[in-house]
Structure formats: structure tokens, C-alpha cells
């Protein structure tokens, strides 16, 4: 997920994307805790994507 793609989305779309990423992060954390995760790098990737979405949301909201 690139920042340029996120900048084109509306605030509502960004909020929906953030919710989806948080759900995915939760699922990956549960897999990690139970030892079922095979691609451990996905957890870090999702975390960085959440940070990207939050950054763009702040820019759009002017805070």
C-alpha cells in the first residue's frame, strides 16, 4: 500500500481501510500467539500500513 494511493482516497475510505487493517492485525496477532503464523513479516507490514493511513488521515483532517 503506497502513500500516494492513500492520498487519493476520501476520509471515509481511509477510515474504512484503517478498520480493515486493524482487524487484519488482530488476526495476525492471534496466529502469532498460537504459533500458527508462517510469514512473520506480515505483522510488521500491516503495522506500517496502519501508520500510513493514520498519517494521511491527520493530514486530511488538518490536525
Curated annotation (Swiss-Prot):
Q: Which GO CC annotations does the UniProt entry carry?
A: cytosolic large ribosomal subunit
Claim: Transcription is one of the keywords in the record: no
Q: Which residues form a coiled coil?
A: none
Alphabetically, the GO molecular function entries are:
structural constituent of ribosome
Q: Which InterPro entries match?
A: Ribosomal_protein_uL29, Ribosomal_uL29, Ribosomal_uL29_CS, Ribosomal_uL29_sf
Keywords attached to this Swiss-Prot or TrEMBL record, sorted alphabetically, are:
Ribonucleoprotein, Ribosomal protein
Which PROSITE patterns does the record match to this protein? RIBOSOMAL_L29
An example of a Pfam family matching this protein is Ribosomal_L29
GO biological process terms on file: translation
Q: Which HAMAP family match?
A: Ribosomal_uL29 (MF_00374)
Show the NCBIfam families listed in the entry.
L29
Family membership, please give it.
Answer: Belongs to the universal ribosomal protein uL29 family.
What protein name does the entry list? Large ribosomal subunit protein uL29
| Source organism of this protein record | Alcanivorax borkumensis (strain ATCC 700651 / DSM 11573 / NCIMB 13689 / SK2)
Gene field: rpmC
Amino acid at each position: 500500500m503506497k502513500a500516494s494511493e492513500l492520498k487519493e482516497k476520501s476520509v471515509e475510505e481511509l477510515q474504512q481501510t484503517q478498520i480493515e487493517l486493524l482487524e487484519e492485525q488482530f488476526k495476525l496477532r492471534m496466529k502469532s500467539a498460537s504459533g500458527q503464523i508462517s510469514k512473520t513479516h506480515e505483522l510488521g507490514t500491516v503495522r506500517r500500513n496502519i501508520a500510513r493511513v493514520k498519517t494521511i488521515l491527520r493530514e486530511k483532517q488538518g490536525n
